């Protein structure tokens, strides 16, 4: 289980971006972090894996406080998939192998090789693509490679920062479906920052809304209603309703 308790964060010489944030996520849950631009969604993700130093609060993952752990220890437990795909001039297989780096001592082992092969197969990366260079494959395939790298880390917590923002609708569905299935299959915790509420309701079972640096709502996605969305998002809508779990926002 992940328990975030009274977490606050402010960049230097700025007001608090996150103020007393508390929420919990169980194994097997897929949590969507929602909110307006500047609400602190990506900042929260970076606090969870200590990219940003948290001065106040705790992040307890399976009874261990990540805030008190060293970076290399966190890397064994937490994987982050960002919206920007690394532009390294390496092969697909080598990119996925980087996911094992936190676990290795001096060299990669047969176990590392097995885990990497399994990760690529599970994500659906064809064997004839293993030797292809990252720069030569499509955006959708690149994002699958980054997911395979995260899976190769064998994480307890998978963080995703707008992982489908640069993809077309078809590839958005493919990637999020893969993530949803992996979270259930591996019984890990998944947290995604996402702007599209329809996608959040389709693939996630939990939601966390941030507004004015605080938690506005935390609960099941089924509890999301149109008034809540209107309150959180800075939109002027002539249509604002949920119908068959589809939210429509029309300017």
Per-region residue spans from a language model:
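The feature captures the beta-strand-to-loop junction immediately N-terminal to the Walker
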Residues: 34-36
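Conserved catalytic motifs of ABC-family nucleotide-binding domains
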Residues: 154
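Conserved ABC ATPase signature
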Residues: 133-137, 141
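Conserved ABC transporter NBD signature motif
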Residues: 57-65, 74
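Helix-to-loop junction immediately C-terminal to a conserved catalytic motif
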Residues: 49
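Conserved ABC ATPase "signature" region
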Residues: 111-128
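Catalytic Walker B motif of ABC-type/P-loop ATPase nucleotide-binding domains
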Residues: 158-162
């Amino acid at each position: 289980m992940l328990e975030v308790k009274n977490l606050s964060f402010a960049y230097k010489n700025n007001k608090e971006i996150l103020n007393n944030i508390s929420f919990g996520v169980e194994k097997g849950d897929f949590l969507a972090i929602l909110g307006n631009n500047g609400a602190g969604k990506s900042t929260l993700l970076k606090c969870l894996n200590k990219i940003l130093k948290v001065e106040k609060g705790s992040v307890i993952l399976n009874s261990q406080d990540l805030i008190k752990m060293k970076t290399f220890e966190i890397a064994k437990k937490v994987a982050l998939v960002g919206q920007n795909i690394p532009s390294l001039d390496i092969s697909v297989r080598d990119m996925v192998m980087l996911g094992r780096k936190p676990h290795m001592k001096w060299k990669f082992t047969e176990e590392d090789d097995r885990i990497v092969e399994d990760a690529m197969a599970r994500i659906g990366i064809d064997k004839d693509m293993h030797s292809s260079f990252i720069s030569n494959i499509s955006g959708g395939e690149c994002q699958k490679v980054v997911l395979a790298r995260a899976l190769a880390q064998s994480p307890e917590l998978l963080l995703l920062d707008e992982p489908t923002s640069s993809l077309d609708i078809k590839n958005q569905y493919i990637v999020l479906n893969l993530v949803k299935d992996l979270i259930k299959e591996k019984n890990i915790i998944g947290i995604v920052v996402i702007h599209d509420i329809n996608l959040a309701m389709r693939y996630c079972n939990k939601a966390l809304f941030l507004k004015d640096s605080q938690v506005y709502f935390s609960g099941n996605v089924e509890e999301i209603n149109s008034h809540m969305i209107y309150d959180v998002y800075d939109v002027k809508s002539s249509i604002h309703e949920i119908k068959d779990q589809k939210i429509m926002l029309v300017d």
